[in-house]
Amino acid sequence: MTDSLTEVPPAARRALLELANAPTVPVKVLITGGIGTGKTTVLAAARDTLRRSGLTVLACPPPDGEPPETALVIDDAQLLTDTELLRLTERVADSRLTVVAAAEAREHHRALRALTMALERDRPRISLGPLPVAEHLRDCTAGLPFLIHAVSARAQAPAQAAKVALIERLRRLDEPTLDTLLMMSLTHELGVSDVAAALGISVTDARGLVDRAHASGLIESSHTAAFLQSVHDAIAQIVGNAHHHEVETSLLRSQLDISPVSAELALRLAEHGLRDERLADILTRYAADTRDASVRCARLYRAAVHAGAKGLTVRLADALARTGDCTAAATLADDLLSSPDATERAAAVRVAASVAVHDGNTGHAAELFGWLGPHPDTMVSSAATIVFAANGDLATARATLRLKDAGPPTMAARCARNLAEGLLLTMDQPYPVAMAKLGQAIATEQSLSQVIPDSPAALVTLAAIHAGDPVRARSVIGRAVRAGADPLFQRRHLLLSGWIKMQEGQLPSASADVAAASAGTHLHRRDALWAAALQTAISRRTGDIGALQQHWYAAMEALAEYSLDLFALLPLGELWVAAARMRQVDQLQHTLDQALTLLDSLGTPALWSNSLHWAGVHAGILANSPESVAPHGQALGAMVAHSTLAQALSDAGRTWLRVLAENVDADEVTAAARSLSHVGLTSDATRLAGQAALQTSDARVSGAMLQLARDLKLGNDFGEPPSGAGDTEPASGTPPAPRQPPAGSPLSDREREVAELLLLGMPYRDIGARLFISAKTVEHHVARIRQRLGAGSRSEMLSMLRAMLAPESLTADERR
């Protein structure tokens, strides 16, 4: 008994145990379930149990007067005739008789329903259905026992094994039932009248077919779309392509005549190859109504084209570009560049140019718009203005935007025009003036359904970062990330969010953003450059030389294939500073010359020039080259009257040079560092304060500078716990009482930080600068670590630390 129970679904085991007492306590059991859910297995176990208990098992109702030592076990009761079902129902009323019946749950079969009601008077039915299954098997098995068994018993791949088993089982069904399943696997919205109209049968006959289809358990609403598709494909393979097409064509025609066709049904029919003018029109309307959902919009437009729609290629290219399928979008757009329709040709240029910018080829985008020439469509002229400005052609950008709009002033057109006008204002107007216009583009961004070179959120955030307005930058890009943009810009928004956090010293959060942006599919060139540059910046700030080199070379590879534009100056600046650290500036010199020429061609706008010149100051300092620092310092000084950021950077640059000359004025450093933090450069601000602490011989000033660095870091973590939070070591070198180490670890959190940096070979002075503590305090920590570990020498201590920390480092690498 125990062995047989292991094959039985849990829901039926209790009933089988009760059957052992059937000779003295008759039992009535009803088992329902779809195809391959285990009904026959349960009945086999029931027969064995009843026979062991001494009863004679019959497969059909016995004649009247049969001795009570018999039991009825009926399989596939739904196949019995109405007369047989009536007779069986009458025998169920005999309290002396044990009856076990299994059937599909056909609720519209009157005679079967009478039997089930009679059996359920004694106990509720036992319903067999899908079993819990691993996620990777849900789409091919839906948890159905017969498919799970096939997958486990066959040497084929799970999907193939399940497909073969499904086809084998479906071949047992008659053609009308297969036709009904074929239609109902398309959508759950079809009912009896729909099947009747499509198959040309009576409603009564259709009701029976629908009942059988649902009773099969193959089209449950809980099944995944992928499994329903596999059911449909299996039936199509059985009935053949011609019959499949005939049934779906009949369904489409009947649906068009009696009711609106749902988007899901229209999609499936078009994707199965049906061509019909009315179907194409329906899909086109649905696509136009789902512009906010770019992936579904692209699928609908593609299906409409397959169904025979004309003139939708531009809309499809737009939708594909917004989904991030730039290759397909560019291919469609290129095919339309020779279109005789000027409007279609202009839209194709806009799509192709936008994709080119996303792929890091702004030069090609400018060539496309130059070839097109002036065009009155607002979306086209605005996109062209953005491209020409990014490429350094300010005169053409302004001329392009002067064209009178030919189309209606829609919200999308207004958004694009505000974005282009705001961008031009950043070239020669005060930042507040430009941001007021750019802000209007953000307010209507959701109305955009046509692709442009960059998202409004990204361009506004870039302008805010370049202007030293971290509050605005955080707000705009934070909302964009939370709202979830089209796939084309999702990674860009994450990278910009990470960039802001990196500049503010929130390195763990910045790392999380760049990791999220880099996960999954291959990055397009613009995103690849930003991701590699951001990782380079993070590595430089954490002092990870190996990672710095790795990411810098990756960024240089992306940059080598990149057509430099105005919107890539931030990553270029970080690569410049890293190159100076690595003594590799020569490799970047040509690109730097291009960047400076680009800025000159735009009239050296203060907003876009400041960040690159600040990078030049840093690069010159790292290269120990005062003559390299001077021109960038002078450029910043020249822009002080036009830019708050230039004022902060100019003052900070002079202060930094004095600090390096060991001329540390605490008030001056404090003012410069706080100004840097105010413009979003908290990471640079803390480094300036830390550098000042190292360069002064006055312990009091050194302590004040370290405290300043801590204050700046804590003030910009925005809820993220800082690595050194809670530590208050005085600059005098007296170590604080150590915190209790975590359970299982001999080191406190601070000692672990010191140990990790010690293993990197960093001297006490650099460790102190990193952790904003004095070198003397680092020395005390090292002594305490050695004492805690019981190491007899420094080399023994380092060996023990490597043994302790190496496994954790390995785990971290594996996670990455």
Which residues does each PLM region occupy?
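Extended alpha-helical scaffolding segments used for macromolecular assembly and cargo binding
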Residues: P26-K28, H243-T323, A666, A671-V679, ...
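Helix-turn-helix DNA-binding segment
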Residues: L660, P730-R816
